Amino acid sequence: VTSDAFDTLKTHLNQFKILEQNTIFLGNTYFDYPDHFLAKQKMGLRVRQENNDFTLTLKTDGKVVGGLHSRPEYNLSIPDNSVPTTEQLTSLYPFENLPSATLQPIFSTDFNRTFWLISFGASKIEVAFDQGKILSGEKTQPICEIEFELKEGLVSDLFHFVSLLPFEQDVYFSSASK
């Protein structure tokens, strides 16, 4: 979406029952082995900093059904944002053979996330508006996206909720992952 979509989204969401709303800064670094072992397995590994808390997350291969992305993920609280160890990685997922090389940072994302937890129909839907940047070496790319997560309830409620969005252009659905 375009950056001016934030105000439109915020105004639109005010017509629904908002259970929670907050803005946080998220710093993420994504890691893989030099041979791209994790990417070849359709997995992603990141360290996320949220305030003073750090979480190691492994996202495994998922599925896309009707445009809805479902991807299992495993989390581990860690003390800092240093390069994840083999021990940490194997505590998240039962890998059979990991490369002997050290994990290396691939890229980072820094963004502000404003999220709303909305009661809609028989469901709870999280709406997140992310605005920031992707960093890889000397290159940067802006991030400006809206994400929806069905926290509880019916997939049909999620699709109905999204169909009510006030955007007619500059918006597209994607199951792409960072």
What feature does the model see in each segment?
Residues 1-178:
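Phosphate-end processing signature that detects enzymes handling 5′-triphosphorylated RNA
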